[in-house]
């Protein structure tokens, strides 16, 4: 693989240790003492790297790989050259991710620029401003240019990135990572939360009352509550509530440039892809998945386990477990039938030609 000089290596793992970690079964002749220190795709991995093979699409790459080790299923063992130390597992990619997490633990969250320059963990850079009334547990790292407001509380093991702004009375739990230039206001944040660079958390929502003299701002006096193990991608925005809280449930993962409006309630273990958005006062139940650029209108309910396709526009409630696509969004099967029908009608209107003469 390309030299991962941006990330610290853990020191490597032997194939025996990897087999124990992922429950893998070695192929006959596998060198269990081979030390693996890196990761990579089949066509880029080198003798010290581990890769994975989980589909017929990559068998051709597997035949010429020089990876030191590979995770695969019993079906594809014979597709790999004899010099590759092979471990068979049920889910190769999941096992590969577990190995990668172990080899490169520092890659899992934004790191401290201050610590990277040689400072001890838990140090406060002299260029940071921490209000005297703020309460920081031992082991909080504060990078240069960060500002921590009056009465803020931050738990041990948390990193506050360069230029980040933590507002008055904000509470942040333990082992969190707040990326560079993030702003967090009017928020209560749990443990092990990752806020990537440029996020805006807790600013007022888009609330106005229109009148003869224009739009008048509605006071936004709620909070943002982010539960444990949530991750929010770079440049995403989470507005504070107007008269109730905006809530993001435990374990939910939000991609870059996502908009969460005021009073929204998001359940546990939801996944939102980039540029998706949830309008005000909508409730998203547990386990919902939203594709990129999908949008949900205000004051709706998206049921548990529902999946919303990329670029879909949702204007009505979604039942639990539903699969919706299109604009306006409807059942994925219905949307596909309509697309096929429109294509057929267009083809017939052209006298069977595949495309217009233009």
State the predicted function of each range.
Residues 1-122, 126, 192, 198-199, ...:
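Terminal amphipathic alpha-helical/low-complexity segments used for targeting or macromolecular assembly
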């Amino acid at each position: 693989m390309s030299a991962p000089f941006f990330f610290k290596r853990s020191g490597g793992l032997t194939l025996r240790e990897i087999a124990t970690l992922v429950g893998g079964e070695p192929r006959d002749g596998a060198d269990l003492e081979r030390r693996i220190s890196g990761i990579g795709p089949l066509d880029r991995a080198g003798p010290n790297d581990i890769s994975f093979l989980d589909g017929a699409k990559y068998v051709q790459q597997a035949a010429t790989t020089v990876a030191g080790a590979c995770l695969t299923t019993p079906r594809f063992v014979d597709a790999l050259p004899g010099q590759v130390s092979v471990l068979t597992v049920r889910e190769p990619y999941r096992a590969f991710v577990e190995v990668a997490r172990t080899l490169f633990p520092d890659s899992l969250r934004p790191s401290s620029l201050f610590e990277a320059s040689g400072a001890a963990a838990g140090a406060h850079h002299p260029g940071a401003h921490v209000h005297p009334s703020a309460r920081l547990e031992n082991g909080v790292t504060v990078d240069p240019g960060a500002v921590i407001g009056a009465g803020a509380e931050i738990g041990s093991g948390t990193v506050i990135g360069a230029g980040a702004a933590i507002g008055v009375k904000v509470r942040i739990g333990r082992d969190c990572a707040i990326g560079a230039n993030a702003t967090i206001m009017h928020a209560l944040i749990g443990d092990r939360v990752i806020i990537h660079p440029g996020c805006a958390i807790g600013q007022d929502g888009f609330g106005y009352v229109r009148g003869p003299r224009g739009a008048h701002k509605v006071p936004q006096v709620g909070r943002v509550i982010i539960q444990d193990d949530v991750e929010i991608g770079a440049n995403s925005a989470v507005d504070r509530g107007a008269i109730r809280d905006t809530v993001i449930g435990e374990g939910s993962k939000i991609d870059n440039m996502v908009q969460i409006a005021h009073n929204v309630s998001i359940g546990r273990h939801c996944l939102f892809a980039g540029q998706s958005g949830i309008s005000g006062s909508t409730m998203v139940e547990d386990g919902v998945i939203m594709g990129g650029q999908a949008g949900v209108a205000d004051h709706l309910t998206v049921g548990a386990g529902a999946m919303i396709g990329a670029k879909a526009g949702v204007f009505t409630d979604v039942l639990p477990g539903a699969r919706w696509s299109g604009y306006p969004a409807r059942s994925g099967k219905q949307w596909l039938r309509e697309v096929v029908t429109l294509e057929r009608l267009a083809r017939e209107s052209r006298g069977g030609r595949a495309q217009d003469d233009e």
